[in-house]
């Protein structure tokens, strides 16, 4: 018999609807829905009215780390549904002007260092990407998806074999407007 003890509880704000089925947590607010799978043998989630309780079967550093991570992820889900996440990136070039556009679920970077073939970066999840002048704005309700999309864009402009202190062309994250 496992002795489950409450490790942490998260209060759900008014207007949010939470459902836990098995190991999947689904949170809805204002017509938007986000869900995430939380599966672990030592930690489980229990819905109790307007709170989500994180119960743990052990009290060691590994389990405490999982509890803290899950609490942070649930709080980020609530914050994402309420306010959203928006990152801002800057297009930086010295000689060859880059053309950045969004086509479907990819960001296309043309004329990077005068290259003939365009570079692409994947847009993850329900993230929206807009390009205005020399700025790229990434917005969405999932912090993980927004951050991963920004990383994909920044990684697609890496120049291999050159000193990055000298060749500073690329698209760089300048603001996490959370």
Swiss-Prot record:
**Family statement:** Belongs to the universal ribosomal protein uL6 family.
Superkingdom of the organism of origin = Archaea
Q: Which gene encodes it?
A: rpl6
Q: Which GO terms describe its molecular function?
A: rRNA binding; structural constituent of ribosome
* Assembly behavior: Part of the 50S ribosomal subunit.
Name assigned to this protein: Large ribosomal subunit protein uL6
Is Chloroplast one of the keywords? no
Q: Quote the Pfam families the UniProt record gives.
A: Ribosomal_L6 (PF00347)
What SUPFAM superfamilies does its record include? Ribosomal protein L6
Tell me the Gene3D superfamilies matching this sequence. Ribosomal protein L6, alpha-beta domain (3.90.930.12)
What is a biological process (GO) this protein takes part in? cytoplasmic translation
Q: Name one GO cellular component term.
A: cytosolic large ribosomal subunit
The residues forming the signal peptide are: none
Provide the function of this protein: This protein binds to the 23S rRNA, and is important in its secondary structure. It is located near the subunit interface in the base of the L7/L12 stalk, and near the tRNA binding site of the peptidyltransferase center.
Q: Does the keyword RNA-binding apply?
A: yes
Key words of the record: Ribonucleoprotein, Ribosomal protein, RNA-binding, rRNA-binding
